[in-house]
Amino acid sequence: MSSGNTKDKHRAYKRKGSPGRDERKRPWQPHHRSRSRSPIRRSGETSSGSYRQEHQISHLSSCTASKISDPVTKTKENTSGKRDSRTNPYTVFSQHKASHPDAPGWCGFYWHSTRIARNGTNAIFNEMKQQFQQLQLDNKIGWDSARELLFSQKKSLDQQYRNMFWHFRNASDCERCNYWDNVYRMHLAHVSSQTESEEITDEEMLSAAESMETDASN
């Protein structure tokens, strides 16, 4: 065999390439990209699942925000000058007294229970506040001082409740009690359950009582 033919075969073999060399290249060939644009997470969760989860969280957040905003809106409506439909015995009795000047003096379960509640609120904003300021150190008080304040208010309220119970026990036929209790029962019978379910705050009760006392003095 001539040297020329040997060289030609060697060149052809190099152009064709070695089969083993091609097999070694195959594992390193890049894979074709998937047409889907949703990458697979390690846990098997796709981006669509992540979207659903984020959407649920966003929905819960919006619902929570709406629930929180309801009391705020209600407060703004009450302080914006609009008439508040909620009532308490003080307002009902004062309105009735204004239209019935011959009505008897205040008495009855609703009157006394509201009066004692007003006294407790008034004690917190006045007497107990002053006592706290006298006992506080860096705007703080210890347990002994707090216990003293609590027992002081308890003693006052206990006495008022005992007086009310004594009156109901020994004056069961009190005309004034029957009169004013019937007035408030008639009021409750003509109001909606939604209005009565709304709780009156201590500040509103105290403000109504002060207005009533001012009207009575005039």
UniProtKB/Swiss-Prot annotation:
Q: Where is this region: Disordered?
A: 1-89, 195-218
Q: Which InterPro entries match?
A: Bocavirus_NP1 (IPR021075)
UniProt entry keywords in alphabetical sequence: Activator, Host nucleus, Transcription, Transcription regulation
Give residue spans, biased composition: Acidic residues: 196-205
Compositional bias (Polar residues) at which positions?
58-67
Enumerate composition-biased segments (Basic residues). Answer: 8-18, 27-40
The GO cellular component terms are: host cell nucleus
UniProt subcellular location: Host nucleus
Spell out the Pfam families in the cross-references: NP1-WLL
Chief site of localization: host cell
Feature: compositional bias, Basic and acidic residues: 73-86
Any idea what job this protein has? Required for the expression of the capsid proteins. Performs the splicing and internal polyadenylation of the viral capsid-encoding mRNA precursor, which allows its maturation and expression. Transactivates the viral promoter.
Q: Which family does it belong to?
A: Belongs to the Bocaparvovirus Non-structural protein NP-1 family.
What name goes with this protein? Non-structural protein NP-1
